[in-house]
Amino acid sequence: MSIPNNLRYSEEHEWVKTEGNEVVIGITHFAQGELGDIVFVELPEVGATIEANEPFGSVESVKTVSELYAPVSGKVVAVNEELSDQPELVNESPYEGAWMVKVELSDASQVEKLLTAEKYAEMTNQD
């Protein structure tokens, strides 16, 4: 699967899509492939504050439990409730159906510090 050029990426394999002063966050195709079949997703409540580089939730797969690290800081304004009933969406549609949280940015400049698609591809040895 190709890496979408319109997103930014963290070294912990989260993607970020900018929508005005908000961002949508999910995990990458590479990450879901490494984790295997996702069976449970734990996300923060709407209204929670998340801090860049700090855990904001977790995903449980048949192999392991892995923490989700916030690529940016801000206030959670929406969570993807579908993932409670359909955690497999993370495997099936990591960039579309399996977005995790929408966050109102506290510092928009944090997005620019994230990896471009090209840099993320280099980091993960993907073409």
UniProtKB/Swiss-Prot annotation:
It holds the Pfam family GCV_H. GO terms for cellular component: cytosol; glycine cleavage complex. Transmembrane segments: none annotated. InterPro entries: 2-oxoA_DH_lipoyl-BS, Biotin_lipoyl, GCV_H, GCV_H/Fam206, GCV_H_sub, Single_hybrid_motif. Residues 22-104 form the Lipoyl-binding domain. CDD domains: GCS_H. Its cofactor is (R)-lipoate. PROSITE patterns: BIOTINYL_LIPOYL, LIPOYL. Keywords: Lipoyl. One of its GO terms (biological process) is glycine decarboxylation via glycine cleavage system. Binds 1 lipoyl cofactor covalently. The modification N6-lipoyllysine is found at residue 63. The glycine cleavage system catalyzes the degradation of glycine. The H protein shuttles the methylamine group of glycine from the P protein to the T protein. Is also involved in protein lipoylation via its role as an octanoyl/lipoyl carrier protein intermediate. Belongs to the GcvH family. The glycine cleavage system is composed of four proteins: P, T, L and H. This is Glycine cleavage system H protein. The gene is gcvH.
